[in-house]
Regions:
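Acidic/His-rich, metal-assisted hydrolase cores and their charged scaffolds
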Residues: 1-215
């Protein structure tokens, strides 16, 4: 991903990195630290970073985060977003383009072919981010019924998964030795269900399931 960012910045463009507020935003800042970019942080990730700094015992690499934050410029009010747009990289919520400051930045940059939006997290089908990957168009408002507009800037997705893989999930579930497992989130749940030696429920969105404790 860093080489892709280099290419965009070298040609005079700006990079928007939509990110989940907790974890991914801070991870990206640490990845970008020391690379020579002018990095701005906006949205919920900014507020969470401040909270994490107050609780260093909850972090595995508090030094790395503090180092990254010292090199990061914070968007403290909406007027500063114009300053952020003159920088190199903007890390902002929401990670699936469901709202937040990223909407403002995309309004400004969506027709700038020198710039780019790089998605770094899973995009749930039906979300704005998933629609952008599939169609090249995205909504500029939170309302799911609002019209979708063409995006001309470069769009790409990079895998920085914060989730366990198939083998890790199997190991964890087997260690718990459950009677029943409910698999809800994921691209393809059936292969994992097939590898489990217990009752597996694959609920559909909007369909209630009834749970009863065994006697």
């Amino acid at each position: 991903m860093l080489s892709a960012i280099d290419a965009i910045v070298s040609r005079g463009g700006r990079v928007i990195l939509p990110a989940f507020g907790l974890g991914r935003s801070q991870e990206l800042l640490m990845l970008l630290a020391g690379q020579g970019y002018e990095v701005w942080l906006d949205g919920m990730g900014r507020d969470i970073a401040r909270i994490l700094q107050k609780h260093p015992g909850a972090l595995r690499n508090v030094g790395g985060l503090n180092h990254a934050l010292k090199q990061t410029r914070f968007v403290r009010h909406w007027r500063m977003r114009e300053q952020a747009l003159r920088g190199d990289v903007i890390v902002t919520t929401a990670g699936m383009l469901s709202g937040g400051p990223v909407m403002h930045y995309m309004q400004e940059l969506r027709h700038d072919e020198k710039s780019a939006l790089f998605l770094t997290g899973f995009q749930v089908p039906g979300t704005n981010g998933h629609q952008l990957l599939e169609t090249g168009r995205m909504r500029m408002e939170r309302d799911s019924e609002s019209p979708a507009f063409r995006v001309d800037c470069e769009v790409a997705q990079f895998s920085l998964s914060g989730h366990a893989g198939h083998a890790q999930l199997l190991e964890f579930i087997r260690a718990c030795d459950p009677e029943r497992v409910i698999l809800y989130h994921g691209d393809d749940r059936q292969p994992l269900a097939d590898d489990l030696d217990c009752e597996v429920i694959l609920p559909e969105e909007g369909v209630p399931i009834q749970l009863s404790s065994s006697s």
